[in-house]
């Protein structure tokens, strides 16, 4: 268009030098050359761009292949549930119930968010109960299921080892429990004085939220010691971490795998989890430094902080981040399970007040023969009715649907020839074992003294205790895979219940009966909206 315009202009101006008339032709030739050159450049650029895109996509594919867990071959058993779509927890419970009934003694699978889980028949428990971690691994199972790298669910997320905390619980906490009972009792009394009103008349209490804080205080006394265990910022930190970490996991999982690292900056719950770790580092820094000095001099406190430092390798011992996370992880485990177990027991007692007097009579009889200021490690097991009531409550209101969850590390051949391949997730159906008609008489009915009566039979003294494990007692696992903290938890739970039963009458607000438990990922949780009425007992 510019060339035509120039030519017309020249025709109307005859005074212009004639050799200029040839310039538009040369300009046209130059423009054609330039367009041809530009075309070649653009073509080459497009080729480079396409090549760059292909390389980028290939790099992303390689990166994904590196971070994506390698899935084992699909297990040859019926898949009864798919959690990768919208989660229906009621359907999951129904599925596992039906699976246990329809495939009793056989395998079935659940497609969970983190991968396929093979539900094993209980007949294989005996051959798996003693296998070491390098064959059946808990750390890897938890890390994959709870996305620990991003959620900070376990100590592995900051470079530590779960085994360090486990060793502290096994080798120190459990063995010194007898010396800690006085501290546990003192903290239970203190926590009720601080958190429960006088209750001279019937007083409405948000019992579950109160118990979360009571358990945090009592556990903190053993985990970090006074005065930090009563520090409000410390208590808020461990409670908020416990609540936020469970909500954070499904939100992290919603991110594309390669972008999950961004959740730390973009997601409110994940940011809160990391903030809790930063707070714990700040709070624990002087305590950890002081404890290290004491340990070097051959002294030191009797608490989890000191035991974790003692059992740490050099890397863990030198890392404030790891030591702080150990406090968070241990507190989370205690607060989450213990508070719910106590709440369920209180709900069962409030719904069945006929059990209160026999439990009080048992406590009174024990005190008559052992007039101690508090229950010690040797006297606590003598409360057989209380132990039985707790076990029955736990049987019908478990924390989890499944137990003994593990990830297979090395090939394992079972006695029927089935091979469990590396990378596979396994579990046993806890809730269904607890409700098996072949194991329990009238399993759907609550019998608070069921296990006391079973223990009275010859040879059953230890078999049916609250902390007992076995093929028909999966609440705390089995064999080397049993929960190492169950003895501390049991004594803490009983101490709280003894104080409550001894000092208060309680009932539900209104004639509501036993409230239904709620479903959340993993199992039953007591309904947090339920309120309990407390009234202080007048004792002679």
Curated annotation (Swiss-Prot):
This is Cytochrome P450 monooxygenase ORF5. The keyword Protease does not apply. One of its GO terms (cellular component) is membrane. Gene3D superfamilies: Cytochrome P450 (1.10.630.10). One of its GO terms (molecular function) is oxidoreductase activity, acting on paired donors, with incorporation or reduction of molecular oxygen. The chain crosses the membrane at residues 48-68. Heme binds at residue 483. It comes from Penicillium roqueforti (strain FM164). Its cofactor is heme. It is an enzyme of class 1 (oxidoreductase). It is found in: Membrane. It is a single-pass membrane protein. GO terms for biological process: mycotoxin biosynthetic process. Disruption phenotype: Impairs the production of PR-toxin as well as of the intermediate eremofortin A, but accumulates eremofortin B. Glycans are attached at residues 376, 460. The keyword Cytoplasm does not apply. Coiled coil: none annotated. Belongs to the cytochrome P450 family. PANTHER family: CYTOCHROME P450 (PTHR46206), CYTOCHROME P450 MONOOXYGENASE AN1598-RELATED (PTHR46206:SF6). Cytochrome P450 monooxygenase; part of the gene cluster that mediates the biosynthesis of PR-toxin, a bicyclic sesquiterpene belonging to the eremophilane class and acting as a mycotoxin. The first step of the pathway is catalyzed by the aristolochene synthase which performs the cyclization of trans,trans-farnesyl diphosphate (FPP) to the bicyclic sesquiterpene aristolochene. Following the formation of aristolochene, the non-oxygenated aristolochene is converted to the trioxygenated intermediate eremofortin B, via 7-epi-neopetasone. Pathway: Sesquiterpene biosynthesis. Keywords: Glycoprotein, Heme, Iron, Membrane, Metal-binding, Monooxygenase, Oxidoreductase, Transmembrane, Transmembrane helix. Its EC number is 1.-.-.-. It comes from the Eukaryota.
